[in-house]
Amino acid sequence: MTSQPVPNETIIVLPSNVINFSQAEKPEPTNQGQDSLKKHLHAEIKVIGTIQILCGMMVLSLGIILASASFSPNFTQVTSTLLNSAYPFIGPFFFIISGSLSIATEKRLTKLLVHSSLVGSILSALSALVGFIILSVKQATLNPASLQCELDKNNIPTRSYVSYFYHDSLYTTDCYTAKASLAGTLSLMLICTLLEFCLAVLTAVLRWKQAYSDFPGSVLFLPHSYIGNSGMSSKMTHDCGYEELLTS
């Protein structure tokens, strides 16, 4: 069996901003599903941005509820530390900004928006990490606070009717109910924070690849006879954006 001669071909690497062939000379697309894949990717990133905004609004709403609610002195220390850290208000700000930049970048892909979305995603991931640590610590302190609440409720002084009535009014809310409501609120904030951290890291990786890709060009396989057509070889000689790899 004799080997057939293989015609010479040229591999030309072209930047995406200089590919402008005429309609008659343009090669046929080899993978039509790539455009569909890009459209699905853009749609998924928009969905990710929307989820980030919703997470930010959820954490902000729960933070406002915690700030306006009143708890027994045993649980006040748990909520006051969380509110003093300002995470329920600063964290959602970064979440909403990051999600908005992700959506805006997909609508109009520019270098400035890509870098802005990258910075926003990094800040959002860092704030979510800090918030996750704070919420985990505060949720771990709920059990000791609930036990102390039960002890204080059982040790109400009964020296006089006035004193008993005063101390009893402080503990009209059941300790278990207060613990359950706080645990539910902190759990929702923790879930939204963890989800935001994962989405922010994913978005940051995508934006990093977009912003600092080594060669954002296209690879075209053209026959050797195409090089002599329409002065392509002379153009490649003077244009440093082309890289020609000849195979014999």
From Swiss-Prot:
Tissue specificity remark: Variable expression in some B-cell, myelomonocytic, and erythroleukemia cell lines.
Residue ranges that the Swiss-Prot or TrEMBL entry lists as coiled coil: none
One Gene Ontology term from the biological process aspect of the record: cell surface receptor signaling pathway
Transmembrane segments: 47-67, 85-105, 117-137, 186-206
Subcellular location: Membrane
Keywords assigned: Membrane, Receptor, Transmembrane, Transmembrane helix
Residue spans, topological domain Cytoplasmic: 1-46, 106-116, 207-248
Entry GO terms, CC: plasma membrane; trans-Golgi network
One Pfam short name: CD20
Domain of life (superkingdom): Eukaryota
Main location (coarse class): membrane
Membrane topology value: Multi-pass membrane protein
Extracellular side: 68-84, 138-185
Protein role: May be involved in signal transduction as a component of a multimeric receptor complex.
Family affiliation: Belongs to the MS4A family.
Name of the protein described by the UniProt record: Membrane-spanning 4-domains subfamily A member 6A
Originating organism: Homo sapiens
